[in-house]
Amino acid sequence: QHWSYGLRPGGKRNAERLGDSFQEMDKEVDQLAEPQHLECTVHWPRSPLRDLRGVLESLIEEE
């Protein structure tokens, strides 16, 4: 039972809204079934450790 779907704690349900709640859940399930285009919006600042790692790797490759 989940309160956001009009269900109440203790098993009590609002009978008038119960049909609406199930329709809402059905729509959400349909949306989840559709493929989602996700794209990363987090841009990490350059890490000094990553830069150092790159320098060390290039030095090792030169040897």
UniProtKB/Swiss-Prot annotation:
Q: Where are the Pyrrolidone carboxylic acid modifications?
A: Q1
For this UniProt entry, the molecular function terms from Gene Ontology, in alphabetical order, are:
gonadotropin hormone-releasing hormone activity; gonadotropin-releasing hormone receptor binding
Q: Does the keyword Chaperone apply?
A: no
Site feature: Appears to be essential for biological activity: W3
- Primary localization: secreted
A cellular component term (GO) from this record? extracellular space
Query: Where does the protein end up?
Result: Secreted
Keyword set, alphabetical order: Amidation, Cleavage on pair of basic residues, Hormone, Pyrrolidone carboxylic acid, Secreted
Sites of Glycine amide modification: G10
| One protein family per Pfam | GnRH
For site (Cleavage), what residue positions does UniProt give? Answer: W3, S4, Y5, G6, L7, R8, G10, G11
Task: Briefly state the protein's biological role.
Answer: Stimulates the secretion of gonadotropins; it stimulates the secretion of both luteinizing and follicle-stimulating hormones.
Give the family from UniProt. Belongs to the GnRH family.
Q: What is this protein called?
A: Progonadoliberin-1
Instruction: Provide the species name.
Output: Mesocricetus auratus
Q: What is the lineage of its organism?
A: Eukaryota, Metazoa, Chordata, Craniata, Vertebrata
